[in-house]
């Protein structure tokens, strides 16, 4: 007798071993049809994701996985990657298959083939995939010995697959999945039949080196996406279109903010308007430092290699570091700011009464990222971090983390991000420090989030070897997630670099160090800002807050006068005194995403008014100039993120 416990706590008895599919069928035909896999738990072990054909031969807990579950969607995508390989082999028998994992929102599969695939090939492959899916062929799992599997794949000319299998220990069973005439290596699980794969689309072609090594053959990578429903896929494709429209690289060029060029790969050439935007972000964060007990510091750009060896960076990060030599000494260009802050802490002896001690820096860092990974401002080689480090005692951890989270939430709101996801990464197997210290640190992080009303996920084992951390992920205007801020507990670096304070018993102790950043890379954050706002920066951030346009030459003097008045009050304003038609001026400045366009003619000059237009179709008509000044002051003071038709709106 086998007893199956379902997620609602109900139990079902079966006379003998039973498959996941049979359990689903016994519950109802609807569930049986929707079942993609099962999540089985035996004897309180970790749940195991299995095929619907998996036979349960002892008492267990079982959850039926359908397309509505996150695991179900991953299963669909993984199985669609295999369907892609099946279709490619059907159309191009000489192609060799390699690997095909699930990635965010889809999957890819790498192939070796004698000629490059074309967009027309992609269309043919997708059509073949749909044909194979309609055949609804059963997907079956088979277990082979390693040597038999290697021999088989060599015999059919699949040398890459044979190489992968040969690297698996000889005593391990190899699982293969067969659908129709196609068989592939995979741990599984997979959908029960190809007919479960109804909604998919091939997206693009790219190159990828075998095993990520540039000395190996360049393979052809086909990317695809797959979804449970057509509505979900349509929403995703619409999001991609919107993301392309908002691409910060295009907007940066169109709005004359910055550019990139081959002579400085991964580095940014800031234009005047772009640098003005940068300065607004930096000045805002500088005020955040000042108002929240941080002391701003500045550490050197390059430091002797001996220091990077002490911190462990040279052993673990040297491939990403730039180095230089002078007078027979080797220096490392800093990839991060923390070692410099410890040196500043170590420059004097600190009492426990001085803690927590908070340092902040707009630290310029350089990392030798692979050229293929560079992506506009989102992945660069030179960047500036709003980096901060807090030196505190173990007892101060929770308060510091709670205060930081509350501060971070306010900063994100001011920049227009209202949805934040929270994740706590806990102790890995390899770590330093006692379990007691880890317990205390992890509890402090979780309690700090609870105190600030945050729901959070736990990522077991994803903390660094030197301490747990909280990751803060932003959700932007089109639903994308951006991992941004972090606060990381560090038990290691203070000890490695000899940081000490004197406790209440006159004993020297190593402080706990908290690495924290709110924006992270300012370059990346500004790229996110541009895309979140589609280039239409709110008035408090906009490089140009208003443009004053004269309708004709007689009103040019008044336009120049009020422009000067606004500039003297600290606003970023330009005058457009050209002899162009006013409709052309308005259109040009609207395309430049200027928050306010002030139109003035003879009537406005006589009455001391301005006709106010703005983003989003705003048209206030003619209002007193002083009223506009008050409105703009309110926009800046409140950091209002949308130009509102009603000046009283927030």
Swiss-Prot record:
Alphabetized InterPro entries for the sequence: aa-tRNA-synt_IIb (IPR002314), aa-tRNA-synth_II (IPR006195), aa-tRNA-synth_II/BPL/LPL (IPR045864), Anticodon-bd (IPR004154), Anticodon-bd_dom_sf (IPR036621), Beta-grasp_dom_sf (IPR012675), TGS (IPR004095), TGS-like (IPR012676)
GO MF annotations, alphabetized: ATP binding; metal ion binding; threonine-tRNA ligase activity; tRNA binding
Database matches in CDD domains: TGS_ThrRS, ThrRS_anticodon, ThrRS_core
Cofactor(s) the protein requires to work: Zn(2+)
Cell cycle is among the record's keywords: no
Principal location listed in the UniProt entry: cytoplasm
Domain TGS: from-to ranges: 1-66
Assembly notes: Homodimer.
Binding positions for Zn(2+) per the UniProt entry: 338, 389, 515
GO cellular component: cytosol
Enzyme class label: ligase
Biological process annotations from GO: threonyl-tRNA aminoacylation
Function description: Catalyzes the attachment of threonine to tRNA(Thr) in a two-step reaction: L-threonine is first activated by ATP to form Thr-AMP and then transferred to the acceptor end of tRNA(Thr). Also edits incorrectly charged L-seryl-tRNA(Thr).
Disulphide-bonded residues: none
PROSITE patterns: AA_TRNA_LIGASE_II, TGS
Ranges for region Catalytic: 247-538
Subcellular location: Cytoplasm
Name recorded for this polypeptide: Threonine--tRNA ligase
Top-level lineage group: Bacteria
The entry's keywords: Aminoacyl-tRNA synthetase, ATP-binding, Cytoplasm, Ligase, Metal-binding, Nucleotide-binding, Protein biosynthesis, RNA-binding, tRNA-binding, Zinc
PANTHER family found in the cross-reference section: THREONINE--TRNA LIGASE, CHLOROPLASTIC_MITOCHONDRIAL 2, THREONINE-TRNA LIGASE
EC number: 6.1.1.3
Family per similarity comment: Belongs to the class-II aminoacyl-tRNA synthetase family.
Cofactor note text: Binds 1 zinc ion per subunit.
Organism: Bordetella avium (strain 197N)
């Amino acid at each position: 007798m086998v007893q199956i416990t379902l997620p609602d706590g109900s139990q079902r008895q079966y006379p003998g071993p039973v498959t996941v599919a049979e359990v689903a069928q016994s519950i109802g035909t609807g569930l049986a049809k929707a079942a993609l896999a099962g999540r089985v738990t035996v004897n309180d072990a970790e749940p195991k994701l299995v095929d619907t054909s998996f036979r349960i031969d002892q008492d267990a807990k079982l959850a039926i996985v359908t397309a509505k579950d996150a695991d179900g969607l991953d299963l669909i995508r993984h199985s669609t990657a295999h369907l892609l390989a099946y279709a490619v082999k059907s159309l191009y028998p000489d192609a060799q298959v390699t690997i095909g994992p699930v990635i965010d929102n889809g999957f890819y599969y790498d192939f070796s083939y004698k000629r490059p695939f074309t967009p027309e090939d992609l269309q043919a492959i997708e059509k073949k995939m749909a044909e194979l899916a309609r055949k609804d062929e059963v997907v079956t799992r088979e277990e082979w010995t390693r040597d038999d599997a290697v021999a088989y794949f060599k015999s059919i000319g699949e040398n890459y697959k044979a190489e992968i299998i040969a690297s698996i220990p000889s005593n391990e069973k190899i699982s293969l999945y067969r659908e129709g005439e196609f068989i592939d290596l995979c741990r599984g699980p997979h959908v029960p039949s190809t007919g479960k794969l109804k909604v998919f689309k091939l997206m693009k072609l790219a190159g990828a080196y075998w095993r990520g090594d540039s000395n190996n053959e360049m393979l052809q990578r086909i990317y695809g996406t797959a979804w449970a429903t057509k509505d979900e896929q349509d929403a995703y494709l619409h999001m991609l279109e919107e993301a392309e429209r908002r691409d910060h690289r295009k907007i940066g060029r169109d709005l004359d903010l910055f550019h990139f060029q081959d002579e400085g790969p991964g580095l940014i050439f800031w234009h005047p308007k772009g640098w003005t935007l940068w300065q607004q972000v930096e000045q805002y964060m500088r005020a955040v430092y000042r108002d929240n007990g941080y002391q701003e510091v500045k550490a050197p750009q390059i430091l002797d290699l001996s220091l990077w060896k002490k911190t462990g960076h040279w052993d673990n990060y040297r491939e990403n570091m730039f180095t230089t030599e002078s007078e027979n000494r080797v220096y490392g260009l800093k990839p991060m700011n923390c070692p410099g802050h410890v040196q500043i802490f170590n420059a004097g002896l600190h009492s426990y009464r001085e803690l927590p001690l908070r340092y902040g820096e707009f630290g310029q860092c350089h990392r030798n990222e692979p050229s293929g990974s560079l992506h506009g401002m989102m992945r660069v080689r030179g960047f500036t971090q709003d980096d901060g480090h807090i030196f505190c005692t173990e007892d101060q951890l929770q308060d510091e983390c709670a205060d930081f989270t509350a501060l971070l939430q306010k900063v994100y709101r001011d920049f227009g991000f209202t949805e934040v996801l929270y994740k706590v990464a806990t102790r890995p197997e390899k770590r330093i420090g006692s379990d007691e210290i880890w317990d205390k640190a992890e509890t402090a992080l979780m309690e700090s989030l609870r105190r600030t009303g945050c729901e959070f996920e736990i990522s077991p084992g994803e903390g660094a070897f030197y301490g747990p951390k909280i990751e803060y992920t932003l959700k932007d205007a089109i639903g994308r997630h951006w991992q941004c801020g972090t606060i990381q507990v560090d038990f290691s670096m203070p000890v490695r670099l000899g940081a000490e304070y004197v406790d209440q018993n006159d004993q020297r102790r190593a402080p706990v160090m908290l690495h924290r950043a709110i924006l992270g890379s300012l370059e990346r954050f500004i790229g996110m800002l541009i895309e979140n706002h589609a280039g239409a920066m709110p008035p408090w951030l906009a490089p140009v807050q208003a443009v004053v346009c004269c309708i004709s030459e007689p009103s040019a003097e008044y336009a120049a006068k009020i422009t000067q008045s606004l500039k003297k009050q600290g606003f970023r304003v330009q005058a457009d005194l050209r002899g162009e038609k006013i409709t052309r001026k308005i259109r040009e400045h609207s395309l430049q995403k200027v928050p306010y366009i002030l139109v003035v003619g003879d009537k406005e000059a006589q009455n001391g008014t301005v006709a106010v237009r703005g983003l989003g179709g705003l048209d206030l008509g003619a209002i007193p100039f002083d009223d506009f000044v008050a409105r703009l002051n309110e926009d800046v003071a409140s950091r209002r993120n949308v130009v509102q038709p009603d000046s009283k709106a927030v």
